[in-house]
Regions:
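N-terminal signal peptide
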Residues: 4-24
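LRR N-terminal entry segment and analogous cap-like coil->beta motifs
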Residues: 29-67, 73-76, 421-428
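Leucine-rich repeat
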Residues: 30, 50-52, 72-77, 96-101, ...
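Consensus "Asn ladder" position of solenoid repeat domains
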Residues: 39, 60, 81-84, 105-108, ...
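Recurring C-terminal helix/loop segment of individual leucine-rich repeat
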Residues: 43-47, 65-71, 89-95, 116-122, ...
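Leucine-rich repeat domain C-terminal region
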Residues: 108-118, 211, 222, 232-233, ...
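Solenoidal tandem-repeat scaffolds enriched in leucines and small polar residues
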Residues: 111-300, 311, 320-322, 348
Length: 584
């Protein structure tokens, strides 16, 4: 016992000296950059040394940035304190960061001491990038925080509790170029709220509660996101100055009509998906269809000129609306259109309107070819109710390379081919019986075609002759019968083929020798043997999952020994006694 008492002072001295010794920081550090992300810090690390310019302190438990002497941080330019528990920032601390350019404070509690914090922010004279997202800030709080940041260029106020943008909220930030206000509760933007922001180029107002945008006057904007609001009306200001807007996202709103953008000559990307647009034809406007009443409806005038100024639009998304017709005249005014989506609408017929708004039979040309030819290269029409595409349809799309017609009810027509290259003689087109099938032959520029889930039960001979397809999707057509001649004409072009989920047995899946086929999906069928036509194809990827295969023919594997890179075989009743092919 005496010995233990004699040793106790020595033990205590050793312990105290160990506690006094500074602990090594669990941070990644270089001369100018330090990252202490997610290391459990509860206070600002003062002992990081001189010359640090980049400091990352996100995902910690720091509550205060106040009353601290910060030696060595006079050179700091970038500070990230997102995802902490920060609620207090003092002027004393910020005064020691004269070179700070970027301050990221997202996902903290800056609503709690906003007035004192906002006063401290007045010392951030050189700040250019500020993130105040997800801090439970109301409109007046956000305005107070930025009330003296005259050099600010990028501001993130997303995921807060702002309900309005009052006049003057941005008067002190005239150099602002990018502004994120998404995921708030903004219902009102007072006239003149953005008036001071003459350099503003990018605005994100997605996921708010806006009902109407009228007199839109931000002519200098390049990118505007208004998706996921409750907009029924979007009307730009009728001024002489053109808009510089290039990207406009109005998706997931309640728009009843195509927005009026007469001066948006530089617009290249327009997203109108997930709205309530039922027609693109002139004269379809009826004010009573609006849920709310707007004084702007009196001058809302729908004509063919609605899209006349959109000469640079290359990408237009109208998917998931209520369109019933495909109006060629409307899209013709979009002279630069490359990608068009009308997926998930109510299309049953391709619009048969003439230039005089009359209706003509679908098997006749609806108007002179030069008045309606589209420049579209990619067209998405999946998930509609289209039964037939008239024979002139592809003539009006001479640049078309990709078309998705999945989940419709189209039946390809037969075309008679003579040679392996797919040449058609004059008059060889087989007429569509009663206009019930769609001619996919002789479309020379078409490269990618999807006809999945079209209830196709029989593929006619030479259905794609003189159409040099690179990829063809025929999946989801249960019970499909495909004779050997069905893909005649594709021997020298087809590289990717999907016959997935067709429940085809051996007698229904005959393939010609496809000299360029690299990717083949035969999964979800009832095959016990592979089609022999495949053996001459230079396959790189083969999917035969969920069939009735007992083995893979050795002849096929030998043929593919130098090309095959991956094969999927799960879900087949392979015999364990005949797996020698695995060694091939």
């Amino acid at each position: 016992g005496c010995l233990l008492l004699w040793l106790l002072p020595s033990v205590l001295r050793a312990q105290s000296s160990e506690e006094a010794r500074p602990r090594s920081m669990p941070c990644q550090q270089s001369p100018a950059k330090v990252s202490c992300k997610g290391v459990g810090l509860r206070k600002f690390p003062k002992e990081l040394g001189q010359g640090v310019k980049y400091l990352e302190l996100s995902n910690n438990f720091i509550q205060n940035l106040s009353g601290s002497y910060l030696p060595g941080f006079g050179q700091l330019e970038y500070l990230d304190m997102c995802f902490n528990q920060l609620e207090a920032v003092s002027a004393t601390t910020l005064a020691q960061l004269p070179r700070l350019r970027s301050l990221l404070l997202g996902s903290n509690h800056l609503d709690r001491n906003y007035y004192a914090n906002g006063q401290a922010f007045r010392l951030l004279r050189n700040i250019e990038v500020l993130d105040l997202s997800a801090n439970n800030l109301e409109s007046h709080m956000a305005g107070w925080y930025i009330s003296n940041l005259t050099r600010l260029r990028v501001l993130d106020l997303s995921r807060n509790k702002m309900t309005r943008l009052p006049v003057g909220i941005f008067w002190s930030t005239p150099r602002l170029r990018e502004l994120d206000l998404s995921n708030n509760y903004i219902m009102e933007i007072e006239e003149g709220a953005f008036e001071a922001l003459e350099l503003l180029e990018v605005v994100n107002l997605a996921l708010n509660s806006l009902h109407c945008i009228s007199g839109f006057s931000l002519t200098q904007l390049r990118v505007l996101n208004l998706s996921h609001n409750a907009l029924e009306l979007f009307v730009s200001e009728e001024g002489a100055e053109p808009y510089l807007l290039q990207v406009l996202d109005l998706s997931h709103n309640r728009l009843l009509y195509f927005p009026e953008l007469p001066k948006a000559h530089y617009l290249t990307h327009l997203n109108l998906s997930n709205n309530l647009i039922a027609s693109l034809l002139p004269g379809s406007h009826h004010p009573g269809e609006f849920v709310l009443r707007y004084t702007e409806m009196a001058r809302f005038n729908r004509t063919l000129h609605t899209a006349a100024g959109l000469t640079h639009v290359a990408d237009l998304d109208l998917s998931n609306n209520r369109l019933q017709l495909f109006p060629f005249t409307f899209f013709h005014s979009l002279g630069s259109l490359q990608s068009l989506s009308l997926a998930m609408n109510c299309l049953q017929d391709i619009a048969r309107e003439s230039l005089t708004d009359g209706m003509e039979p679908s098997d006749h040309l609806p108007m002179p070819l030069e008045h309606a030819t589209l420049s579209v290269r990619s067209l998405d029409l999946h998930s509609n109710a289209i039964h037939v595409l008239p024979r002139w349809f592809f003539d009006y799309l001479p640049q078309l390379e990709t078309i998705d017609l999945g989940s419709n009810s189209l039946q390809p027509c037969e075309s008679q081919g003579s040679d392996r290259g797919g040449n058609l003689g004059e008059g060889s087109h087989v007429p569509a019986p009663g206009g019930t099938c769609t001619p996919f032959y002789n479309v020379p520029r078409l490269k990618h075609l999807s006809l999945c889930k079209n209830n196709i039960t029989r593929l006619q001979p030479y259905a794609f002759n003189q159409t040099s397809l690179l990829s063809l999707d025929l999946s989801g057509n249960k019970g499909l019968f495909m004779p050997k001649e069905a893909l005649g004409g594709l021997e020298l072009s087809l590289q990717k083929l999907s016959l997935r989920g067709n429940q085809m047995d051996n007698s229904k899946a005959e393939l010609p020798c496809l000299d360029t086929l690299k990717v083949l999906d035969l999964s979800g069928n009832n095959l016990s043997l592979l089609p022999t036509g495949l053996f001459c194809s230079p396959l790189e990827s083969l999917d035969v999952r969920n069939n009735n295969l007992l083995t893979l023919e050795k002849l096929a594997l030998v043929s593919w020994s130098h090309s095959l890179k991956d094969v999927s075989i799960a879900g087949n009743p392979f015999s364990c006694c005949s797996l020698a092919w695995l060694d091939t």
